[in-house]
Amino acid sequence: MNLNLAGADAGTVEVSDATFGKEFNESLVHQVVTAYFAAGRQGTRAQKTRSEVRGGGKKPWRQKGTGRARAGTIRSPLWRSGGVTFAARPQDYTQKVNRKMYRAAMRSILSELVRQERLVVVDSFEVDAPKTKQLVAKLKDLDLEKALIVTEDIDEKLFLAARNIPYVDVVDVAAADPVSLVAFDKVLVTVSALRKFEEKLG
């Protein structure tokens, strides 16, 4: 498969069909993205049952003869300041996604980006200094506004230049994940990053 190079770099680049020519597997991508967000949940909620609330060891009044309903503790769930009947417990929300599934989801997403013409390939992409103005101008030349920039390795100048631009992010191939790839309108990727994707996912 050949992809057209964008910008001043005329020509095409050949990529592997095994990485960029797969059918879109919506259910798999959904599962991987759901697992990604689930792993970010804290799950630290906690409440106390009647046995965990402080106090309540003494019987409030005797069992019989008062005319009142019997009571064994002031920490009954029926009482104010009592325990919770079915108290919430800390919970681990992580879902298992094995390596084979993750790689298949990444291939599926990259292939769909190619089909939708949302993958913009350039020979190289860098700025002379960590200046936002420079990066905005370069993105404008490529007609890009909301974009994820993927390079082979993190370029510190590029990273600093992008920090103050809303809806623009810079990651290297190792940090590119299914959620970041689907979140942006366009994904700008260098040829060297493409080769790294092929090596990583092939």
Curated annotation (Swiss-Prot):
Q: Does the keyword Cell wall biogenesis/degradation apply?
A: no
| Intrachain disulfide bonds | none
In terms of domain of life, where is this protein from?
Bacteria
What GO biological process term is on the record, naming one? translation
Region (Disordered) residue ranges read: 44-67
InterPro entries the record matches: Ribosomal_uL4 (IPR002136), Ribosomal_uL4-like (IPR013005), Ribosomal_uL4_dom_sf (IPR023574)
**Gene3D superfamilies recorded:** 3.40.1370.10
Give the keywords, sorted. Ribonucleoprotein, Ribosomal protein, RNA-binding, rRNA-binding
- Pfam families given in the database record: Ribosomal_L4 (PF00573)
Here the segments flagged for biased composition (Basic residues) are: 56-67
A GO molecular-function descriptor = structural constituent of ribosome
Which is a Gene Ontology cellular component entry for this protein? ribosome
Q: How does it assemble?
A: Part of the 50S ribosomal subunit.
Quote the function comment for this protein: One of the primary rRNA binding proteins, this protein initially binds near the 5'-end of the 23S rRNA. It is important during the early stages of 50S assembly. It makes multiple contacts with different domains of the 23S rRNA in the assembled 50S subunit and ribosome. Forms part of the polypeptide exit tunnel.
- Family as reported in the entry's similarity comment: Belongs to the universal ribosomal protein uL4 family.
* Name by which UniProt lists this protein: Large ribosomal subunit protein uL4
In its UniProt entry, the species of origin is given as: Chromohalobacter salexigens (strain ATCC BAA-138 / DSM 3043 / CIP 106854 / NCIMB 13768 / 1H11)
Q: What is the lineage of its organism?
A: Bacteria, Pseudomonadati, Pseudomonadota, Gammaproteobacteria, Oceanospirillales
Its gene name is rplD
